[in-house]
A protein has these predicted regions:
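Active-site bordering "gate/hinge" segments
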Residues: 1-232, 238-241, 331-333, 371-373, ...
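Dual-mode signal for accessory low-complexity, basic/Gly-rich regions
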Residues: 173, 184-405
Length: 405
């Protein structure tokens, strides 16, 4: 196969150097292997939570599902590196649906997938009971909520929503293979091209984005990547300026780096490792405000929680995002929910409008199990941590009006 394919390639493959790591073992942090828990215990926990929703007034249907993965990966290369790694991850989602003369509305839990074991389903790790208790009233309020008036609003975006905006507008945009055109015929390229490294004003001076393989319970946390590179942490955006990319050993030289930062991944032995996202996160402001103070600082705005649908162009530049909950803010106080909300911007305008970054108390690690990339397609789990943040006068669309209904 290699000999047959060789005439099609015009670039010589050369890997940047990496120290040898012989016979290394790494295991992610978790308490309870989900595969050690009986199916009946799993079903009972989900049934207990979903039945509480069904018992509430205004909830006509409830669904609950959980996914859990134990990944065991062994790597060896001809330079002498050999690693054995194991990591565990969990994702649980519970939905409440209301059906009536209004049509239907839904709302789901805000719990994020993460590198936990079955302990993730305990209330001392994530307060499931409290969220389930609040969900029916929030759903009823959403059903009765007015449709948003389109225009420009200050947006207070919760990390349960902002993680996805980071993923689409920063995570994918700063994949170096995408920036140099390797993904052009599948999922697009990037506006953040290599000629802009060190000069592109990605966002406001409050914006500090890092890539890492170290975050506790991160879905992209590993000891070594799939080219035998040890985990690292590095700056991607510093004080609002693009300063780094996600690299593997094959493409690092394109930005004059003599070492990869450990972003190679293959989702199975049948696939070649390609550059994939590490944990890509927005740093909180160490002295930043808590959530109540952020709400109090807004005269006219919307507080957005939870992710739903999104759209972004093939250069990771023009986008729009919706969410699960949209709370009106008037004169520093929450003033009921809205619906049919989407926010729309370009990547640099949006991040350039970030005027407040929340403190550590607002920080949440979000993410997804199912980031796709490559041909043949590969799936990777990814995490994005961030605090709540306030964005100045962002364009808000009414999704029903935009659909012509």
């Amino acid at each position: 196969m290699a000999k047959t394919s060789k005439p099609l390639s015009t670039d010589e493959i050369s890997l940047v150097a990496e120290p040898v790591y012989a016979n290394k073992t790494w295991v992610s942090k978790y308490e309870i292997d989900p595969f050690s828990v009986s199916d009946s215990e799993k079903k009972d926990r989900l049934a207990s939570l979903s039945s509480k929703l069904l018992a509430a007034k205004g909830v006509n249907h409830a669904s609950a599902h959980t996914m859990f993965v134990k990944e065991q990966k062994h790597y060896a290369d001809s330079h002498g590196t050999s690693t054995s790694q194991q990591r565990v991850r969990m994702q649980t989602q519970i939905d409440a649906i209301s059906v009536g003369s209004h049509g239907f509305e839904s709302m789901r839990t805000l719990a994020q997938p993460a590198g936990f074991g079955w302990e993730w389903m305990r209330n001392d790790v994530y307060d499931w009971d409290s969220e389930i208790e609040k969900l029916p009233a929030l759903l009823a309020e959403k059903v009765a909520a007015p449709s948003v008036t389109p225009g420009r609003y200050d947006l207070l975006i919760d990390p349960t929503n902002l993680w996805l905006t980071i993923h689409e507008s920063i995570g994918h945009a700063t994949e170096l293979d995408r920036a140099i055109g390797y993904e052009a015929n599948y999922a697009g390229t990037s506006f953040a091209t290599v000629d802009k490294l060190g000069t592109l004003k990605y966002g406001s001076p409050l914006m500090n984005i890092t890539g890492d393989r170290f975050t506790d319970h991160g879905l992209s946390t590993v000891g070594y990547d799939d080219e035998g590179v040890a985990g690292q942490e590095w700056d991607i955006v510093k004080d609002g300026i693009l300063v780094g990319y996600q690299l593997d050993r094959r493409i690092a030289a394109h930005v004059n780096r003599d070492r990869s930062n450990g972003c190679a991944f293959a989702d199975s032995p049948a696939h070649v490792p390609i550059q994939r996202m590490p944990n890509v996160s927005l740093k909180p402001n160490p002295a930043g405000p808590d959530l109540p103070a952020m709400i109090e600082s807004i005269d006219d705005g919307i507080y957005i929680l939870g992710d739903k649908s999104w759209s972004i162009d093939m250069q990771r530049y023009n986008f729009q995002f919706t969410g699960q909950q949209f709370h009106r803010i008037k004169n520093g106080k929450l003033a009921g929910q809205l619906k049919d909300v989407a926010y729309q911007a370009t990547t640099t305008d949006f991040w350039g409008s970030m005027k407040v970054v929340g403190g550590p108390s607002t920080y949440v690690l979000g993410g997804a199990f199912n980031c796709g990339k490559g041909q043949p397609g590969q799936i990777a789990a990814v995490s994005h941590g961030c605090p709540a943040a306030i964005f100045d006068k962002v364009n808000v669309l009414n999704t029903v009006a935009e659909a012509g209904k």
